[in-house]
């Protein structure tokens, strides 16, 4: 088991994927400096404008769905979910499901991590999840409630040595009878992250225990 490998391995794979995507887009990007200059800068104090609420494309988590989880929630239209068998762990949780944004036109994943049952505090689980990865700063925690489930959410900055940039990321956690669940949203950069936030918010808003 790759205990503690967590997002480090995933980010390496992501960078390899992006290399091909960015190479294919390089010609279109030449001569269009206006787009590059318009890309938002990651800060801990401000958030970019949010798009309208995402349209549901179905739900996951229940028995027989693409990913069977301790919780259920809606995924955005055109996003695709796939159960993960690889034993990747980050802190107290292991990767259970990846929800891919590429079919919807974005580069990134909504990833679901699940842990073993116990009496762990929800915020402690989320703090341990972030502590298991280098480059995390400016964490801002808050509580939320959805469908009778209460949880903790965090927004933070992640500094990537691989991509030589700092970008926003988000995650929320809940504790169920079957163990803790962490739902994480990254993205290529802050712009991609902001564009995918409606899908993340849809998941949090429709969250229920399975």
Language model regions located:
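Short, hydrophobic/aromatic-rich segments at coil-to-beta transitions
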Residues: 56-63, 93, 148-156
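Signature of long, low-cysteine stretches enriched in small and polar/charged residues
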Residues: 126-174
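Bacterial N-terminal signal peptides that target proteins for export
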Residues: 1-13
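Post-signal peptide N-terminal segment of mature Sec-exported envelope proteins
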Residues: 34-61
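Bacterial signal peptide processing site
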Residues: 26-29
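Surface-exposed amphipathic alpha-helical segments
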Residues: 79, 181-210
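Secretory pathway targeting signatures of secreted, lumenal, and periplasmic proteins
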Residues: 62-121
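C-terminal motif of bacterial Sec signal peptides marking the signal peptidase cleavage site
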Residues: 21-24
């Amino acid at each position: 088991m790759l205990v503690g490998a967590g997002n480090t391995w995933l980010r390496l794979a992501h960078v390899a994927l992006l290399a091909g995507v960015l190479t294919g887009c390089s010609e279109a990007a030449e001569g269009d400096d206006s787009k590059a200059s318009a890309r938002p800068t990651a800060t801990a104090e401000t958030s970019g404008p949010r798009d309208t609420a995402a349209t549901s494309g179905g739900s996951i988590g229940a028995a027989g769905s693409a990913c069977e989880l301790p919780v259920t929630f809606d995924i955005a239209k055109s996003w695709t979910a796939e159960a993960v068998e690889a034993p990747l762990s980050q802190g107290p949780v292991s990767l259970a499901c990846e929800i891919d944004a590429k079919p919807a036109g974005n580069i990134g994943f909504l990833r679901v991590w699940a842990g073993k049952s116990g009496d762990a505090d929800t915020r402690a689980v989320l703090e341990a999840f972030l502590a298991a990865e280098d480059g995390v700063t400016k964490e801002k925690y808050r509580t939320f409630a959805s469908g009778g489930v209460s949880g903790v959410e965090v927004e933070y900055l992640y500094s990537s040595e691989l991509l030589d940039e700092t970008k926003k990321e988000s995650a929320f956690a809940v504790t169920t009878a079957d163990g803790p669940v962490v739902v994480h949203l990254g993205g290529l950069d802050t712009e991609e992250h902001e564009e995918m936030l409606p899908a993340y918010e849809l998941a949090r808003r429709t969250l229920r225990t399975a």
